[in-house]
Amino acid sequence: MSKPPRDYARIGTNTYFVTASAWGHRSLFQSERIASLLINTLSHYRSAQKYLLHEFVIMPNHIHLMFTPSEITLERAMQFVKGGFSYRVKKELGIDAEVWARGYVDHRIRDQNDYERHLSYVRNNPVKAGLVKLAEEYPYSSAREGIELDPRPQGLKPRIMKTA
C-alpha cells in the first residue's frame, strides 16, 4: 500500500506561509509583464478553487504567499502555482528559460498571532527592501487596493493576550 501524502490528514484545513525563489535568484519578477502574469496565475488557481489566497507579495527575485490549499496537498498547490506560471511564461511570453529555483520554504500557520506576524511580514517586505515607503504603494502585492483575496482562515487558535 502506498504512503499517503504528508498533509493527507489535514488537506483543506492548514494555512501556510510559503516562499519560492526565482532560478538563480535572478530579479525575474521585477518585470511588469512577468509580475502581472504571476498575479493573474495566482488569481486563476484561486478562482478554480485550488486554494484560498489570503496574502501575497511578488518581490523582484522571490514570492511570499499565505494560502490554504483546498482539497489538495501543499505540494500540489505549489505545483499549480510554480508549474502553471512557468507554462504561461513560456507560452504567452515566449521565454524558454528556467523560472523557479527548486523547492520552496513553507511554514504552517499555527494561530492568530502567527498569522498576524506573517501577514505583517508579507505586507511590509517591499517597504523593508526599500522598494516603496508604504506597503500599499507596491504594485505586486495584495496590500494594494483592488486585489481580491479570501478572508482570514477560520479555526485558528485565538491570540493569547498577556496581562500585567
Task: Label every model-predicted segment.
Residues 1-164:
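Short catalytic/metal-binding and nucleic-acid-binding patches
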